[in-house]
């Protein structure tokens, strides 16, 4: 199955003084944009965020 790249920008919650962007996952934990790779949740869907791109998690796992 081909990867689906998320084209819509993710809604980041906040930035710090260094310009790092943060978001909150479904468990309420914060993740920082530079802490890659990471699993993130957007509108109830699970995404794999790596090197500045977000992929649907189910499509990412099919690559392995």
Feature locations, PLM:
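Glycine/tyrosine- and acidic-biased, solvent-exposed loop/turn segments at the edges of beta-strands
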Residues: 1-64
């Amino acid at each position: 199955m081909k990867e689906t790249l998320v084209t819509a920008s993710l809604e980041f919650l906040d930035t710090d003084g260094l310009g790092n962007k943060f978001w909150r996952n479904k468990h309420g934990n914060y993740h920082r944009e530079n802490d890659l790779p990471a699993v993130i949740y957007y509108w109830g869907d699970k995404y794999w965020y790596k090197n500045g791109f977000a992929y649907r998690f189910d499509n990412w796992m099919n690559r392995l």
